[in-house]
UniProtKB/Swiss-Prot annotation:
Purpose: May play a role in photosystem I and II biogenesis.
GO CC field: chloroplast thylakoid membrane
Statement: the UniProt record of this protein carries the keyword Thylakoid: yes
Domain of life: Eukaryota
Localization annotation: Plastid, Chloroplast thylakoid membrane
Membrane topology: Single-pass membrane protein
Originating species: Tetradesmus obliquus (Green alga)
UniProt keyword annotation of Transmembrane helix present: yes
Name of the protein in its database record: Protein PsbN
Transmembrane segments: 6-26
Keywords, ordered alphabetically: Chloroplast, Membrane, Plastid, Thylakoid, Transmembrane, Transmembrane helix
Any one Gene Ontology BP term: photosynthesis
Amino acid sequence: MDSPAFFFTFFLWFLLLSATGYSIYVSFGPPSKKLRDPFEEHED
């Protein structure tokens, strides 16, 4: 457990899970109300 590879792997997993959680929060949470929809802005 003292190897640097363990801590590096743990850090990468934490970074990946944090980025995934934040993107889901922005996409579907309260901040999603501020996102614009370019398909609704453009009419053909």
